[in-house]
Amino acid sequence: ENCNKGLIHMDASSRDENAIAGLIYLTPNADLNSGTSIYKLKDNYKFKEEDGEHILKLKKELYLNDNIDTKEWDKMIKKNHNDFDETIKFNNVYNRMICYNTFEWHSAMSTNAGDDDRLTLIFFIRGIHAGMYPLTRVSSMPC
């Protein structure tokens, strides 16, 4: 049920204070619902370090094509998605590029792009030197 959902995560590390993540969808005629969602943590969410370690272990098993326990993965994805509210949804449209702050929580809406694999080009832009991002500038202006 949840096996085709992506894991909600962020790409940030301590060196990514002024970094942008982006991706370009490269599957022609993909299922629109195989795009990307941006999330915010629910107010009552309390992150536990062991949750993060468990997620990394399962993710490594998945990427290395080890025999992953699909019931365990399904349970973890369900819990992961229950901790967040979706705020933005980008449909998978061929050659569409999206960008977001590396501190934004995000996931693949579905890993099933239809007849073909969900193919994306992921990139990071680091070392942006500016006083403030446009959104920060606008947010700090008096009304």
Regions found by a protein language model. Give the residues of each.
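Catalytic core of non-heme Fe(II) oxygenases with the double-stranded beta-helix
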Residues: 2-143
